A protein has these predicted regions:
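N-terminal hydrophobic/helix-forming segments and targeting peptides
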Residues: 1-302
Length: 302
């Protein structure tokens, strides 16, 4: 869990993923020689902070987005949401501009957002929720479990993966944008026909804590049922706890796979959280274990 704590302390509001990308690259460099297969690494300016790891001869790709929701400063103490953060008066926000570190409170006035910092903040500065990590015997609670748990899962998968792509993407929380060029690169270098999305969903009346990872049959978008049935069959065979999710809203990097010109099947597989997009996101540790285990199993057997 130590690496997860480090991941949770990195800032990466959508569009500003350079810090978390460098942290991941450093972590990969430190660990890759201890993995079962040492991957080829694709990163840098040609990939806009995204990272692609190629293990062996891939059949399947696992995607995990690096960015988070947050805020950006405008003028006269105004804030604009990045993605869809929860907004409650008094939330503690942090960031940094050219004049130094920032710690302030969110102010909600007539559906408009402001900060209370004692000086003007440079327009275009990113602010994120102050981090407060809490772990007990059953849950982890913190800001940005979405999608730090996906990144953590992907790194765990890397340890024993023999064949597959593992991709760390950007922009997901604010409409996407990196997936088209990532898919093009994959399909031009070592094409695949199937993909898994390691991301976080929400607790509902049908997906509850401690009952296993959620396998999404649909959200706003509907993946091909033939592939979903294959994933469910393998999950059943694995005996790893899982739940089936059916929703009419929400989305992920899977949307951009479905809208791409490539015939790639996809499935969202992730733990469910309470207090979505808030400083107090809460996920069952048992469900996180299931998320890691099932991604490892699926990447081996698909």
């Amino acid at each position: 869990m130590k690496i997860l704590h480090h991941l949770l302390k990195q800032s990466s509001v959508s569009g500003n993923e350079s810090q978390i990308a460098q942290f991941l690259l450093d972590t990969i460099e430190q660990r890759k020689n201890d993995w079962k297969v040492c991957p080829q690494i694709y990163s840098g300016e040609d990939f806009h902070d995204c990272i692609l790891l190629k293990f062996g001869n891939p059949r399947t790709a696992l995607f995990a987005h690096m960015d988070t929701i947050g805020f950006m400063t405008r003028y006269e103490n105004q804030l604009i949401p990045v993605g869809g953060p929860e907004t409650e008066d008094g939330m503690l926000l942090i960031g940094e501009d050219e004049l130094g570190p920032i710690e302030c409170r969110l102010k909600v006035e007539d559906d408009s957002l402001f900060h209370d910092f004692q000086r003007p903040i440079q327009p275009g500065t990113y602010l994120s929720f102050a981090q407060n990590i809490r772990v007990d015997g059953e849950y982890i609670q913190a800001a940005y479990l979405d999608n730090r748990l996906g990144l953590y899962t992907a790194l765990q998968v890397c340890e024993n993966l023999e064949h597959g792509w593992v991709i760390f993407s950007t922009y997901e929380e604010h409409g996407g944008g990196s997936m088209p060029f990532l898919l093009k690169f994959i399909q031009e270098n070592h094409p695949i026909r199937q993909a898994l999305i390691a991301d976080i969903t929400w607790v509902t009346e049908g997906v509850v804590p401690h009952e296993g990872v959620a396998i999404s049959i649909r959200d706003r978008y509907i993946p091909r049922r033939k592939f979903i049935d294959r994933v469910i069959a393998l999950a059943t065979e694995s005996k790893i706890p899982f739940q089936l999710e059916v929703e009419a809203s929400g989305g992920s990097d899977g949307r951009e796979i479905q809208f791409s010109p490539y015939p790639i099947d996809w499935c969202f597989v992730g733990a469910a959280e309470d207090n979505v997009h808030s400083p107090d996101e809460k996920v069952s540790l048992a469900d996180l274990d299931s998320m890691i285990d099932i991604h490892q199993y699926l990447m081996k057997h698909l």
